[in-house]
Swiss-Prot record:
GTP binds at residues 322-329, 366-370. GO terms for cellular component: nucleolus; nucleoplasm; nucleus; preribosome, large subunit precursor. It comes from Saccharomyces cerevisiae (strain ATCC 204508 / S288c). One of its GO terms (molecular function) is GTPase activity. This is Nucleolar GTP-binding protein 2. Its main location: nucleus. Belongs to the TRAFAC class YlqF/YawG GTPase family. NOG2 subfamily. GO terms for biological process: regulation of ribosomal subunit export from nucleus; ribosomal large subunit export from nucleus. The gene is NOG2. Residues 1-20 are annotated as: Disordered.
Length: 486
């Protein structure tokens, strides 16, 4: 078969419609017919249009024909995709409510459920006014209207004045509370010309806007949040406001408790606190140490369970939050078996959040310590929780009576090898003379000795702990057992 006129005549004579082995112009060893047609598309030129913009000749890669488009006439386009009866919805809603109250059960694939329909809301908290439930539209408007005046919050001027005074009182109480917490700085009274400072500035540590921004970053980036508590005072180092925030804003995130520094309390105290806190959240006892730790295997196993729950994710992030100096960075170092976070026996060592890789699918996030503001906490409580540095406290000797109240006499005698004091002042004087810490004229250095006692109290050299709350049905430990194990 050829490519000339004879081949064309033969195809017409025999009625052959196939191209045969006809070659495209430009086809050779380097370019096949498909490549040649593709290159000819660029050299064929653009489309040609007239002065009105109508297409006269289309380009080789254009098609002027418009396909007929239509929607398939199917009733499924206009029906419900999923239908559920009211009884089944109510049954599922009640089962879901019981599951959400149990912190040991996890709701998977939350995004595939209509949570706004399943979660029941209080009528009081609902944004709807529900006016028609109390009074019909016909009673207020129209020819049969019975109400002649609009209903106001106050029926007369006296009620309005009373409500206004209550609002002013609430506002003033809030102002006093903010001033007490040190959140508004020094409050100036221009009329009297004096400045009120209810609390030392050092006791507002851990409440700055920068610290709270770091906390929100950690919460937003974490799938699992670990709340680190001090085993000596778990309720005192618990951030309830943060828990309420997570319960309201991020209910899909997991929150667990880790009772750190359990080596500083007796075993029965740690066990009682774990039993008490486990009723609310999963709780683990932990002792942070790279060489000799406790609870490390249980914590890693729990994190692996959370990782297996979220198999649809490539990895999960675990954030550590809590009061300053509770051991968040030490727990991360214990899990990694080496020093990856900077640690110190003083609060405020961690400045910003930090990402650490634990394994292929689990990442850890370290967070600076935060102190939720509370009007119930005194300066003494804040100091004894290790929130502030003792060397920055003015007149530290005023907090020594609180140390003597929280510690047993035998523990102080065993620690400092002294005895025979009657009050805090005499205790400081005896200890100062024993250690030779005297000023000019043989006066004891009360400030220096008091700072030493407070540091020993916070760092665990003096044994102390808070007893767990007693519940009905629980046996109270015997006094002899408490004295023996303390």
């Amino acid at each position: 078969m050829g490519t000339g006129k004879k081949e064309k005549s033969r195809r017409i004579r025999e009625g052959d419609t196939k191209d045969g082995n006809l070659r495209v112009k430009g086809e050779n060893f380097y370019r096949d017919s498909k490549r040649v047609k593709f290159l000819n598309m660029y050299t064929s030129g653009k489309e040609i249009r007239n002065k009105k913009g109508n297409l006269i000749r289309a380009a080789s890669f254009q098609d002027s024909t418009i396909p007929d488009a239509r929607v398939q006439p199917d009733r499924r386009w206009f029906g419900n995709t999923r239908v559920i009866s009211q009884d089944a919805l109510q049954h599922f809603r009640s089962a879901l409510g019981e599951t959400q109250k149990d912190t040991y059960q996890v709701l998977l694939r939350r995004n595939k459920l209509p949570m706004s329909l399943l979660e029941e809301k209080d009528a009081d908290e609902s944004p709807k006014a529900r006016i028609l439930d109390t009074e019909s539209y016909a009673d207020a408007f129209g020819p049969k209207a019975q109400r002649k005046r609009p209903r106001l919050a106050a029926s007369n001027l006296e009620d309005l004045v009373k409500a206004t005074n209550e609002d002013i009182t609430k506002y003033e109480e809030k102002q006093v509370l903010d001033a007490t917490l040190g959140l508004m700085g020094n409050q100036e009274d221009k009329e009297n010309g004096w400045t009120s400072a209810a609390k030392e500035a050092i006791f507002s540590k851990g409440q700055s806007k920068r610290i709270w921004n770091e906390l929100y970053k950690v919460i937003d980036s974490s799938d699992v949040v670990i709340h680190v508590l001090d085993a000596r005072d778990p309720l005192g180092t618990r951030c309830k406001s943060v828990e309420e925030y997570m319960k309201k804003e991020t209910p899909h995130k997991h929150l667990i408790y880790v009772l750190n520094k359990c080596d500083l309390v007796p075993t029965w105290v740690a066990a009682a606190w774990v039993k008490h806190l486990s009723k609310e959240r999963p709780t683990l006892a932990f002792h942070a140490s790279i060489t000799n730790s406790f609870g490390k295997g249980s914590l890693i196993q729990l994190l692996r369970q959370f990782s297996q729950l979220h198999t649809d994710r490539k990895q999960i992030s675990v954030g550590f939050i809590g009061y300053p100096n509770t051991g968040k960075s030490s727990i991360i170092n214990t899990l990694r078996k080496k020093k990856v976070c900077q640690v110190a026996p003083i609060p405020g060592e961690t400045k910003v959040w930090q990402y650490i890789t634990l394994m292929k699918r689990i990442f850890l996030i370290d967070c600076p310590g935060i102190v939720p503001p509370s009007s119930k906490d005194s300066e003494e409580d804040i100091l004894f929780r290790g929130v502030v540095r003792v060397e920055h406290v003015t007149h530290p000797e005023q907090y020594i009576p609180g140390v003597l109240k929280r510690c047993q006499v035998k523990h102080l005698e065993r620690t400092y090898e002294i005895s025979g004091w009657k009050d805090a002042t005499e205790f400081i004087e005896i200890l100062a003379r024993k250690q030779g810490r005297l000023l000019k004229g043989g006066e004891p250095d009360e400030s220096g000795v008091s700072k030493q006692i407070l540091n020993d109290f916070n760092r665990g050299k003096i044994p102390w702990f808070v007893l767990p709350p007693e519940k009905e049905g629980e046996e109270k430990p015997k006094k002899k057992e408490v004295e023996k194990t303390a």
